[in-house]
Amino acid sequence: ILNFKRVVFGPRNEYSEKSIVRICQSLLELDNTSEATTFLERLEKSAEAKENLIYAVSNLMKIYYNDKKYNKATLYGEKLTSFNEVDNRIKSDAYLFIARSSKSLGNKKKALNAYKKLENDSNKEFAVEALYFKAMDNFENKEYLNSNLIIEKISSEFSGYKKWTAKSLLLMSKNFYQLGDAFQASFILESVIENFSHMPNIVDSAKNELTKIKLIESEKNSSVEINN
């Protein structure tokens, strides 16, 4: 790194930009994000090659997100989406970080708009996260049937993504309960408990929801058992 720094801090020449990139790469490999940020910002300002500018902006976006500096992460994500001729995978990354950052900042509208760009993304993991957020938004807006339709899509087309499938089924049980179908809601929760034992957090959530339903229903009908 020291040799590259000598080039960077010396008179600008044909090796200056390449040296900054190499420094950034080395610092990121060492997980020295603090110093990497300094050189990435320098690269962003001075880059002549488009791919180096994109490299700088993309990594700054990720660093700021991981540091919970969500406003800056969003800013750099938006810079990426504004560039022409950017690889679709890089743009998808940008929309994902914009969505997650906006969600963390409580800007649900902006998060929804960013997630919408990912609903049909070739990266299935991005797509299923986007669809889940849409289903959750429908639930919060009391659009329970629409939420369930999205969850059915997740279950049928993204069954390999177990975390999102499990979270979606938990949400589906809430939808059914809000629709007045305590039996179906309970059935789904019992299925989650049985089939996702390798996900203790999911199972705990399902058990808690099932207990709540049984307690509420027991007040309506004393024949409903409270205990599992």
Task: Give residue ranges: language-model regions.
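Acidic, polar-rich low-complexity tracts and alpha-helical solenoid repeat scaffolds
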Residues: 1-228
